[in-house]
A protein has these predicted regions:
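C-terminal substrate-binding/active-site "lid" region of AdoMet-derived donor-dependent transferases
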Residues: 45, 51, 58-109
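S-adenosyl-L-methionine
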Residues: 14-47, 51
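Glycine-centered flexibility motif
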Residues: 36, 55-58
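A structural micro-motif
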Residues: 7, 29-31, 84
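Conserved SAM-binding loop of SAM-dependent methyltransferases across substrates and taxa
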Residues: 1-6
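Conserved SAM-binding motif I beta-strand of class I
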Residues: 8-13
Length: 109
């Protein structure tokens, strides 16, 4: 936000304790905190973003890819432009792992 390129940040966090812990360190920035489960949060129709990044998973597991697909479906309507970006923590790694799992399944079963 301080660089002039980013005008605001919205954080959706399930834990109010985490918000209370982190927010004082960023009070001078234009950050909006929403205490909610991002998987259940219903954004307003006019809520639009240039960049969305999700890192809600406590561990790295290919099961997370299903959540990523669901989030992409929900949030695609909230992209500010066609070039707006949706990213996920460890997505590329998990996609590669899924390919390896599929190769293993077909080879040994």
């Amino acid at each position: 936000v301080k660089n002039g390129i980013v005008s605001s940040i919205t954080v959706i966090e399930i834990s109010q304790d985490v918000i209370d812990l982190v927010s004082p360190y960023y009070k001078d920035l234009n950050i909006k905190y929403i205490c909610s489960d991002v998987m259940k949060y219903k954004p307003a129709k006019d809520e639009k973003y240039d960049t969305m990044y999700f890192d809600i998973w406590p561990d790295i597991c290919t099961d997370n890819l299903d959540d990523m697909k669901r989030l992409s479906y929900i949030w695609r309507y909230h992209k500010k432009t066609a070039d707006s970006w949706i990213g996920y923590w460890q997505k590329d790694y998990l996609l590669e792992r899924r390919k390896q799992e599929k190769r293993y399944e077909t080879r040994y079963y």
